[in-house]
């Protein structure tokens, strides 16, 4: 067992033994921003339904209220689609001789040899970045399909059809099986290995292109934090020149071991933009899906909960209990000082007006930028760039495992 395995086990033990739900007492006077929607501090109310289980599929303390949080924020938070580890799904074939690979953690190697001898039937211990990426993609598609103001419990039939695209089956276009296959074919990632932000972004791009009905283009910034307008337009425009819904993905490293303080305000601003669809990654050795920020604290959905696999349903027909496993009211937060600097940031551009609005907002942000929009992609546009963004790096999946 190496140092990484030991540290991961230590964190998991601490979380299981002592993981109280946060109270709104750290920065109660600060507004909360959830994917571009602002919840002012003066709207703080008691939780409306204290009988609701905040973390469906898990046993919780009988006191399930969320002390001091705005009810409107809680309704928004629990409406986000939450992807987690799953178990007992159809086997994902292993590569020959992979059991002894050092790229697999000790726990994954043991499970591979003792339980999943014929193939991986659970992604517990290795699929957290994939699940975080699925969360980012699913919520982007939910905004397109259901609207940003959609709330849990509404339009159940359409939500079921969306969830079916992410079911734990080789038949689902955005399943764990599809991510792993694309990762093996095009990203040099093998079953049971961690995916970094870059591989996850490439999988999202490839799978979305393969599934025509997604109505979603994907643009990946392939050099640092620069978004080249001409390249973006070549991806987003159709043959008539109309800008189609496009997901912008940026894999960044905002420091070495921690996020450099000069980028704190820029990262906080990401979740305040109306085009934001969240941040995947952002915690050492464990990926989360960050959707909200209050002051210096980021709220996230944690994929490190193993639930039964979701069966594939072509019609999208699921029971209430099955749908409930994709939502939680249970808040978790992390101070920006404790976040890992490697992450995948997403923005959803719905049309040309949205693109112009996003550009204007990015260019007007104060402080050191973490994103730059270039009007041309020639060499002249790079003048002065290294001085302006000397610590923002494109993320290389080989640097760190999430």
From Swiss-Prot:
Keywords assigned by UniProt, alphabetized: Autophagy, Cytoplasm, Hydrolase, Nucleus, Protease, Protein transport, Thiol protease, Transport
Active site location: 128, 302, 304
Compartments, as annotated in UniProt: Cytoplasm; Nucleus; Preautophagosomal structure
Enzyme Commission number(s) from the entry: 3.4.22.-
Annotated GO CC locations: cytoplasm; cytosol; mitochondrion; nucleus; phagophore assembly site
Annotated GO biological process: aggrephagy; autophagosome assembly; mitophagy; piecemeal microautophagy of the nucleus; protein processing; protein targeting to membrane; protein transport
Region (Disordered): 46-68
Enzyme class: hydrolase
Record has Nucleus as a keyword: yes
Domain of life: Eukaryota
Protein's UniProt keywords contain Coiled coil: no
UniProt biased composition (Polar residues): 56-66
A single GO molecular function term of this UniProt record: protein-phosphatidylethanolamide deconjugating activity
Catalytic reaction equation(s): [protein]-C-terminal L-amino acid-glycyl-phosphatidylethanolamide + H2O = [protein]-C-terminal L-amino acid-glycine + a 1,2-diacyl-sn-glycero-3-phosphoethanolamine
Main location: cytoplasm
Family assignment from sequence similarity: Belongs to the peptidase C54 family.
Protein's job: Cysteine protease that plays a key role in cytoplasm to vacuole transport (Cvt) and autophagy by mediating both proteolytic activation and delipidation of ATG8. Required for selective autophagic degradation of the nucleus (nucleophagy) as well as for mitophagy which contributes to regulate mitochondrial quantity and quality by eliminating the mitochondria to a basal level to fulfill cellular energy requirements and preventing excess ROS production. The protease activity is required for proteolytic activation of ATG8: cleaves the C-terminal amino acid of ATG8 to reveal a C-terminal glycine.
Protein name: Cysteine protease atg4
Organism this protein belongs to: Emericella nidulans (strain FGSC A4 / ATCC 38163 / CBS 112.46 / NRRL 194 / M139)
């Amino acid at each position: 067992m190496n140092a990484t395995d030991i540290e991961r086990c230590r964190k998991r033990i601490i979380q299981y033994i002592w993981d109280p739900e946060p109270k709104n007492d750290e920065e109660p006077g600060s507004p909360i921003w959830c994917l571009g929607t602002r919840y002012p501090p003066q709207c703080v109310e008691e939780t409306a339904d204290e009988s609701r289980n905040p973390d469906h599929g898990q046993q919780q303390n009988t006191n399930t209220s969320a002390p001091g949080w705005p009810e409107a924020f809680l309704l928004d938070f629990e409406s986000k689609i939450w992807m987690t580890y799953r178990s007992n799904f159809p086997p994902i074939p292993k590569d020959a001789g992979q059991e002894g690979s050092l790229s697999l953690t000790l726990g994954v190697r043991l499970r591979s040899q003792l339980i999943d001898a014929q193939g991986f039937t659970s992604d517990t211990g290795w699929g957290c970045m994939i699940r975080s990426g699925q969360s980012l993609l699913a919520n982007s598609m939910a905004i397109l399909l259901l609207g940003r103001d959609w709330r849990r419990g509404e339009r159940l039939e359409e939500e079921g059809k969306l969830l079916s695209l992410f079911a734990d089956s080789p038949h689902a276009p955005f399943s764990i099986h599809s991510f792993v296959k694309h990762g093996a074919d095009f990203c040099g990632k093998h079953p049971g290995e961690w995916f970094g932000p870059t591989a996850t972004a490439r999988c999202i791009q490839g799978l979305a292109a393969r599934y025509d009905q997604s109505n979603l283009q994907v643009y990946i910034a392939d050099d640092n934090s620069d978004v080249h307008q001409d390249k973006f337009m070549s991806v987003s425009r159709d043959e008539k020149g109309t800008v189609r819904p496009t997901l912008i993905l940026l894999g960044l490293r905002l420091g070495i071991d921690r996020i450099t303080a000069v980028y704190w305000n820029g990262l906080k601003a990401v979740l305040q933009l109306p085009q934001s669809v969240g941040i995947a990654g952002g915690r050492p050795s464990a990926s989360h899906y960050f959707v909200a920020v209050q002051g210096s604290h980021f709220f996230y959905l944690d994929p490190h909960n193993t639930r039964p696999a979701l069966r594939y349903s072509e019609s999208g027909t699921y029971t209430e209990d099955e749908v409930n496993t994709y939502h939680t009211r249970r808040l978790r937060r992390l101070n920006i000082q404790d976040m890992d600097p490697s992450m995948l940031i997403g923005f959803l551009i719905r049309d040309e007006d949205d693109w112009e609005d996003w550009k204007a907002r990015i260019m007007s942000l104060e402080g050191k930028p973490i994103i730059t929009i270039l009007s041309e992609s020639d060499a002249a546009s790079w003048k002065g760039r290294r001085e302006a963004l000397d610590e923002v790096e494109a993320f290389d999946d080989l640097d760190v495992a999430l």
